[in-house]
């Protein structure tokens, strides 16, 4: 565990939250504001941002913190450059926390996905985080170029990956690889931005209730649901509470449930630890049982495709018979 004594201390600070028009980003904005932390909400859709501002303000009407929003397409690099220039140069606002929460999943079988689906996955789940972080870091370096590395103020970048980056499986080819890329990016930037007093954390949420989660259920293959199991998603606000609590305790690899923590033990690598001694033990156990678990999952996948193929043939035969009757 790195930065074990580095608590968030959100009160009186400023947070920039990208992807704050709904879901986890909006709930993190709510929780931070309730801790008297000023928040800038960033997303593309102004009407959604205004609605979130009203919701958050009504939760703590006597709060001294400020709430504002910026419309920005974080998948567009030049939009991000303009955002940071407006904040740091024009408005003299230098966020202490940068939460990269933009993301969406279209769970389908690989053969059912379209080029547009993949483009959305890349732009929303990876490019947004990359653009915001890179343009922000460049703006800070340019603005404070007269400072030595250790003189930069403390800043904190929080990436949101997913538990499926620990264990990717059928149905998530549009989503999981990009969340794995976020995990990898966080490791690299911990090295490259750390010398400039940036703390870099990566969050790996499990299922939580949100608008996005409801949309996922509409396209999610039955085999994907079967592998995930019937666990009930936690609320978005509970997820935000867990994340902020773990970050405040100094953890830079954050999971939101026990299953996520267990799966994280299977791919420890150079990730910052969370209960590291126990993770090493669980990791050893995983190295023994993982081949068996993979066999069981793959057996179910084979069964799914065989059943699916049989059903498609039967449906085709029924349609063909009906067409022949019409012809006669």
From Swiss-Prot:
GO molecular function per UniProt: 3-dehydrosphinganine reductase activity; NADPH binding
Residues reported in the UniProt entry to bind NADPH: 19, 21, 23, 44, 48, 73
Signal sequence interval, chain numbering: none
Protein's name according to its UniProt entry: 3-ketodihydrosphingosine reductase TSC10
Gene Ontology cellular-component annotations: endoplasmic reticulum membrane; lipid droplet
Keywords: Endoplasmic reticulum, Lipid metabolism, Membrane, NADP, Nucleotide-binding, Oxidoreductase, Sphingolipid metabolism, Transmembrane, Transmembrane helix
Compartments it resides in: Endoplasmic reticulum membrane
GO biological process: 3-keto-sphinganine metabolic process; sphingolipid biosynthetic process
Record-annotated membrane-spanning stretches: 277-297
